[in-house]
Amino acid sequence: MRARVIYNPTSGREIVKKNLVEIFQVYEEAGYETSAYATTPEPNSARNEAERAAKVGFDLIVAAGGDGTINEVVNGIAGLDKRPKLAIIPAGTTNDYARALHIPRNNLVEAAKVIQKEQSFFMDVGEAVMEDKLSYFINIGGGGMLTELTYDVPSQLKSVFGYLAYFVKGAEMLPRIKPIPMHIEYDDGIFEGEATMFLVALTNSIGGFEQIAPDALLDDGKFTLIVVKSSNLVDMMHLVAQVLNGGKHLSNSKILYTKTSKIIARPPNSSNMMINLDGEYGGNAPVTFTNLHQHVEIIASTDDIQKAVDKKDENAEDVEDAFIKEVEELTNTDINGDGEIHSSKKEDHEN
């Protein structure tokens, strides 16, 4: 058997490159003749190599890098009739898919060692068709003014909710959040109206938080569709705080939350709506999203995968608490229901 490690040499201060010998050893001991390819700044470098490696018969492709590298590798193999197994070694900032799979995110060698358990499953892949362009994603798609703002920030903050925490600190950007007209068709109905954004989720982890689509499954053939209908700034911040405070947004009347296998989204007029795929610009609507059920086999410890999140992500608690305090201060509202309106500035001063 042969394995091809496709890695981003610049991810995490070149951490993959520094651990490459040990990573090779893990896969060699698992029975794979292993080689590597370092991605280049050229567009679609990882995608092209993944497609090439699959076509010449590699049995396993290892995507080592951030979510962008993993997305490229998936795009390289998802359209093929014969697809190799996929493994991921997270070396980026958010590492959403590794988080959803419960793959170690702070130790690359331990992430590689997941293969030693000899476990895998077939994961769903999202297909997005825009005009004549076909793309794939494995975590999140979306559109609307809020997702478009993510293109203006540094790459490490490009995830939607990571960016929210960023621009609440920079209040000058908040007035830019405005609803736009949307027409969204899904399995059980049609949404027609103004919305700040819509999200098409395959996993429960978005921007490092696991409560946005808490009941998302990785292999059920369904997207989680989330449409944020609110256009009021205070309501919007309250809604985000609910997301971060234990997934309390699911019953919010300003949210459409449903499961669907296919989505068609477009602006009802000639206006432009950019589409975000796994945190990057993917093209312009109209777009058709299709869930490709159990499309790619991925190496993962199936014993450890938490199919539905029933508690807050402990790793994000500090960020969530700080965000909620910021929102409470800006809106003068008790967001978390503890009977107090907190101020992060006040607490910083006291400390």
Protein language model annotation of sequence segments:
Residues 1-61:
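ATP/NTP phosphate-donor binding region
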Residues 9, 64-66, 89-91:
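Glycine-rich beta-strand-to-loop/alpha-helix junction loops that act as flexible
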Residues 30, 37, 79-196, 200:
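Catalytic core of DAGKc-family lipid kinases
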Residues 142, 146, 199-212, 281:
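Glycine-rich phosphate/pyrophosphate-binding beta-alpha loops
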Residues 157-165, 214-235:
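Gly/Ser/Thr-rich active-site loops/lids in small-molecule metabolic enzymes
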Residues 186-187, 192, 217, 227-315:
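ATP/nucleoside-binding phosphotransfer catalytic cores, i.e., glycine-rich phosphate-binding loops
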Residues 314-351:
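Calcium-binding acidic motifs and repeat modules
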